[in-house]
């Protein structure tokens, strides 16, 4: 029922051809012909794409093994750092700006690709000197800074996989990741500004390292400092001061670990790891198709720490040779036009943001947008959760019209000019797999949909019996493996392949023409403001650290898509749940409502994880508890 209600808000029969792409738009039938050709021999398709990269040793076998143990480009090896950065050395990209960083308080700096390469080598040399070897994990707990990307690229250069951890997580979640990755070095920042307030990142790291028993080194990037450092801590500038040795790039097997994340499952966040060869093939191809070009100035508002921020901030745009904007503040400080100021000031051509952000921004009024000249934008890409049709239209008309007429666009009437494309991505897959492709064969857009499938990904929607369905709600699945198949995964991922295809865990709907609407999770995993949140992780933390039994449910939230409800056994500690979740787990998992129920009910609710309250209110909770789970 709730999936149907989501579909009602998304569904549209409109077919929109943006004036900026009128010259290249094809029918959906023509697009699907190209798509079906790609999945008719999916292995040959990705083999052709793989030849776009430079391989030190070509693969002898395209693919081997049944899912989830499928591996691609067997016996092939490549220099990952070359394919991301060094390949630009002999062309004009080398002297252009690679990264522009702006802090919330207005400070800014920029570096070219050649300067970036120098910094990466310096950090790589320091890591080698500290004893980091290929295969050793490096952890980052920072906002998006130039230094953060330098560390990630230095990790790639020496063959050390990295995991960036979102700073919205608290010390308890950080500690778990430190333990699971067995890292000997952590990079963080002393603090940074968020909505005008100082976020003390270093203090969170200190609590996490103490709680986890971490014995390694903490490298502190000086953002606001200088901080007073402890014996196991060193300033980033001191860590790299003596590092001048030229570091040879690591040549990796295709299946060598590149980076990892902790993905949200029902009972906890679980570590997953992507391979070097398959991921780089997949992210480079999709980055080209979604619209990235070397002359683009690109602004992605999703931070590394989430898959979109890793794939389409750290890797994709730099492989293309684009200029990447990094911003570590909020969209509303000092006012709600901060993002539009950044786009205007730096002549941004491509914006990638989340549905949740646009939902909130659309409710602040049009003038925050219209007072800025956004003519340089040529596409707006959207991801993370369903995008309602009315929010799509607001984005298209208010952000996407601009001031300069183009073909049939009429600025004074806000008719829209550039494409607004909603796309689907998942941490386990690594890249976008649905959406209209700006740099590929482009069909009309249907507002509210996540577009048609992307070539190379065999997508289907199935009912509970595994039968394909059209114009009915089912589960989004992938029928065949993709190049960036995980090389480390939990048992839940194995279970997703149980029936011979990959179950994404998301409800979806497909029109007869082939457009897909992704509707949200069919399990207890929560999607709130674009974040994928594990309910079990919250329950475990509150049990371990407060001693209270809690079950976590989700409710429909018109701003966040879903919000968190905590129902606990009557206890004096129940009143501490909101503050405890902020401190232990991070502000992104703070419940919107805390209620109480008997212990028996708590356990019954945990066994019914697919419950979704249609509104976030005590009345809705009381109704659920009084009427029972039936």
What is each PLM-predicted segment?
Residues 379-380, 387-515, 523-525:
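Conserved AMP-binding/adenylate-forming
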Residues 140, 165-191, 205, 344, ...:
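AMP-binding/adenylate-forming catalytic core of the ANL superfamily
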Residues 36, 82, 99-153, 170-175, ...:
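Conserved AMP-binding/adenylate-forming core of the ANL superfamily
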Residues 157-236, 354-355, 570-572:
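Structural core segment of the AMP-binding/adenylate-forming
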Residues 143, 185-204, 224-225, 328-331, ...:
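Adenylate-forming
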Residues 217, 526, 553-556, 565-567, ...:
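Conserved C-terminal "lid"/linker of ANL adenylate-forming enzymes
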Residues 95-97, 219-221, 225-226, 230-268, ...:
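Conserved pre-ATP/AMP-binding loop-to-beta segment of ANL
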Residues 280-297, 305-350, 363-364:
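Conserved AMP-binding/adenylation subdomain of ANL enzymes
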């Amino acid at each position: 029922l709730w999936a149907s209600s989501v579909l009602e808000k998304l569904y549209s029969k409109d077919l929109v051809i943006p004036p900026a792409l009128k010259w290249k738009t094809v029918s959906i039938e023509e697009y699907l012909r190209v798509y079906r050709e790609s999945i008719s021999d999916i292995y040959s398709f990705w083999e052709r794409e793989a030849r776009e990269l430079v391989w030190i040793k070509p693969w002898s076998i395209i693919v081997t093994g049944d899912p989830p143990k499928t591996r691609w480009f067997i016996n092939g090896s490549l220099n990952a750092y070359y394919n991301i950065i060094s390949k630009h050395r002999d062309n004009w990209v080398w002297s252009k700006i690679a990264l522009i960083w702006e802090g919330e308080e207005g400070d800014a700096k920029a570096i070219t690709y050649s300067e970036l390469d120098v910094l990466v080598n310096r950090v790589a040399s320091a890591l080698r000197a500290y004893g980091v070897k290929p295969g050793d994990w490096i952890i980052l707990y920072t906002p998006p800074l130039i230094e953060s990307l330098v560390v990630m690229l230095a990790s790639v250069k020496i063959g050390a996989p990295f995991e960036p951890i979102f700073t919205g997580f608290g010390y308890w979640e950080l500690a778990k990741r430190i333990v699971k990755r067995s890292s000997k070095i952590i990079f963080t920042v002393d603090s940074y500004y968020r909505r005008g307030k100082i976020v003390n990142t270093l203090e969170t790291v200190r609590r996490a390292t103490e709680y986890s028993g971490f014995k390694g080194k903490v490298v502190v990037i000086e953002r606001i400092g200088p901080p007073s450092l402890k014996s196991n801590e060193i300033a980033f500038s001191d860590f790299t001061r003596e590092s001048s040795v030229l570091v040879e790039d690591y040549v990796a097997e295709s299946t060598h670990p590149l980076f990892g994340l902790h993905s949200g499952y029902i009972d906890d966040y679980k570590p997953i790891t992507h391979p070097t060869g398959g991921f780089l093939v997949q992210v480079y191809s999709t980055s080209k198709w979604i619209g990235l070009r070397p002359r683009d100035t690109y602004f992605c508002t999703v931070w590394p720490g989430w898959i979109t921020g890793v794939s389409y901030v750290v890797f994709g745009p730099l492989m293309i040779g684009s200029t990447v904007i990094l911003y570590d503040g909020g969209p509303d400080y000092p006012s709600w036009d901060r993002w539009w100021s950044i786009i205007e000031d730096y002549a941004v051509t491509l914006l990638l943001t989340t549905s949740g952000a646009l939902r909130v921004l659309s409710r602040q009024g049009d003038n925050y947008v219209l007072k800025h000249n956004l003519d340089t934008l040529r596409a707006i890409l959207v991801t993370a959760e369903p995008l309602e049709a009315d929010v799509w239209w607001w984005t298209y008309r208010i952000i996407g019209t601009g001031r300069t007429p183009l073909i049939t666009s009429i600025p004074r009437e806000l008719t829209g000019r550039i494409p607004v494309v909603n796309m689907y991505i998942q941490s386990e897959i690594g890249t976008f797999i649905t959406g209209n492709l700006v740099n590929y064969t482009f069909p009309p857009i249907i507002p509210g949909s996540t577009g048609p499938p992307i070539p190379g990904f065999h997508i289907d929607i199935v009912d509970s019996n595994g039968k394909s369905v059209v114009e009915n709600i089912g589960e989004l699945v992938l029928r065949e493996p993709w190049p960036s198949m995980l090389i480390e995964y939990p048992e839940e991922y194995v279970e997703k392949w149980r029936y011979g295809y990959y179950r994404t865990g998301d409800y979806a709907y497909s029109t007869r023409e082939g457009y897909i609407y992704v509707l949200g999770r069919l399990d207890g995993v929560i999607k709130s403001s674009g974040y994928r949140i594990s309910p079990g992780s919250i329950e475990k933390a509150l049990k371990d650290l407060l001693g209270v039994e809690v079950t976590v449910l989700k409710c429909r939230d018109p701003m966040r898509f879903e919000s968190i409800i905590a129902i606990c056994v009557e206890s004096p500690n129940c009143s501490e749940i909101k503050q405890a979740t902020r401190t232990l787990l991070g502000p992104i998992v703070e419940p919107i409502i805390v209620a109480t129920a008997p212990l028996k009910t708590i356990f019954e609710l945990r066994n019914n994880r697919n419950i979704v309250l249609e509104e976030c209110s005590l009345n809705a909770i009381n109704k659920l508890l009084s009427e029972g789970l039936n």
